[in-house]
């Protein structure tokens, strides 16, 4: 998911 990257 784009908000669970780093």
Curated annotation (Swiss-Prot):
Subcellular locations according to the entry: Secreted
Gene Ontology cellular component annotations, sorted alphabetically: extracellular region
GO biological process per UniProt: defense response
UniProt keyword list: Amidation, Amphibian defense peptide, Secreted
Residue(s) carrying Glutamic acid 1-amide: 6
Tissue expression per record: Expressed by the skin glands.
Protein name per the record: Tryptophyllin-T2-8
Organism: Pithecopus azureus
Lineage: Eukaryota, Metazoa, Chordata, Craniata, Vertebrata
């Amino acid at each position: 998911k784009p908000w669970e990257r780093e």
